[in-house]
Amino acid sequence: MGKLESSPDVYRFSEHYLPWHAHITAVTVAPEARRLGIGRLLTEQLEVAADAGDAWFVDLFVRVTNHKAITFYKNMGYSVFRVVKDYYGEHSTDPSQSSEDAYDMRKPMKRDVKREHVREDGEKHEVDPSDVW
């Protein structure tokens, strides 16, 4: 599941402003249907829609421990843009629960000729969940 979106214009001058882009909300393939190219096909279709909609990039969030997904997306041209500390977990409602960081991964689309919305050293850029909206 994915969508095209941007941050509200009122935040245009914020360092966390997100211009027009596509966002992968979830890609889920049944275990018995994995490794058949279905996830790649679904992701590529969102990328086609992103280019057709003149988006700057496609982004997604993935747990830093989900090595299979990270490898999958890197093989498709995505890179880590930033690390979102404590993105996953029940720590906000139950402090006794542990949390987990997320990678915000991005792939530039045709519009981003200068690659302004991706970076090579994203693992070094950490933000809090409150910086991601």
Question: What kind of region is each of these model predictions?
Answer:
Residues 1-34, 40-54, 83, 106-116, ...:
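Acetyl-CoA-dependent GNAT
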Residues 43, 66-69, 85-92:
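Short glycine/proline-centered loop/turn elements that form peptide/ligand docking sites
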Residues 59-61, 74, 79-104:
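Conserved catalytic-core motifs of GNAT/GCN5-like acyltransferases
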Residues 97-101, 112, 121:
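Charge-rich, low-complexity terminal tails
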